[in-house]
Amino acid sequence: MATKAKQDFGPVRAAALVGVVLAGGEGRRMGPGVLKPLRLLGDRPMVAHVVERLRPQVMDLVVVANDPLPGLRALKVPIIADPPDLQRAARREGRRLGPLAGILAGMEWARRHHPHAGWILTAPADVPFLPLDLTVRLCGLMHVPEPDVLMVRREHTLAVWSVKLAADLRRAILQEGMRRVEEFARRHRLAELAWPGGGAPFLNINTPEELSAASRRLAPARPRSRR
């Protein structure tokens, strides 16, 4: 079992979280065209819905994307990339980095800009119906001894992470070639949240058909005609 990260911060609080939206996925199943996070859902890009729902739940917010397209800059939040040394290593190996690199980028950004925060909350850019009480529910998992990771069960990128894990995460990616989020999380103290009522709020949009279904869900119900 890996050595557990030492915690120097106080208990995680919703107001002390830095939000990190992971917008680096290629979205190949969506087909050619606009990158998946920028596909329109209603009249706005999918990622804009995630930012809107996550912003009130955190103290600050950043989007991780290696290509800062104008559609992302229009969100008016900081756009950061995966750490450069990780990108170079991935090119040498001919492998994709995956979401762990984005999580590390968020941790390192939070440590530079909010050194007393201690925690980040990650969310993928393709979950536009993100619950408005996600932070409160995840922080409710805190107990003694404190977990290092608070995660929604079966939704591994929806999680609260201690930034103290950054050094170990960097080693795991660079030295071990680790890519699976759950594998890294289970090395540390992990608490999982079984979302009440199932996973409906965490609809991941990966295909044009799922995007169409999400658009129908987003549309306001039409009033029934009277006869």
Report residues per predicted region.
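Nucleotide and nucleotide-moiety/phosphate-recognizing core
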Residues: F9-M178, E183-P201, P208-E209, S215-A221
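Short Lys/Arg-rich cationic patches that frequently serve as NLS/NoLS or arginine-rich RNA/DNA-binding motifs
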Residues: M1-F9, R222-R227
